[in-house]
Design a protein with these regions (language model features):
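Short, C-terminally biased terminal segments at protein or domain edges
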Residues: 1-108
Length: 108
């Protein structure tokens, strides 16, 4: 949930011009989706359901990292303001990938 809050604050800080608004909308959507879909994954009805939902979480975390990278490449914000958030998005991507792999390999 805290990642989603940080993403919303990041989105609010983007420039109010077409490129900034585009990135703000996309990163807010994908970044908050990480938290919402993770919550749904925790309530999965089966292992297959959990794997499907955690895959969505993984994809949204990776997409969020993409939008943060694009923000830097497009010079919408200084790189030093993005470093911690980008690192967190990458770490979450790795965590959710490992979670998915464990769930896939777990024998019931």
């Amino acid at each position: 949930m805290q990642f989603a809050v940080r993403i919303l604050k990041f989105a609010d800080g983007l420039p109010n011009r077409p490129s900034g608004r585009t990135v703000a909308n996309q990163v807010a959507r994908s970044g908050t989706s990480v938290a919402a879909n993770y919550r749904a994954a925790l309530r999965a009805q089966s292992r297959a359901d959990f794997i499907n939902k955690i895959t969505t979480v993984l994809e949204e975390a990776d997409e969020t990292a993409f939008w943060i990278e694009l923000t830097e490449l497009a010079n919408l914000l200084p790189a030093k303001r993005l470093a911690a958030l980008h690192t967190e998005a990458e770490e979450l991507t790795k965590i959710f990938n490992a979670t998915r792999m464990t769930a896939r390999n777990h024998k019931s």
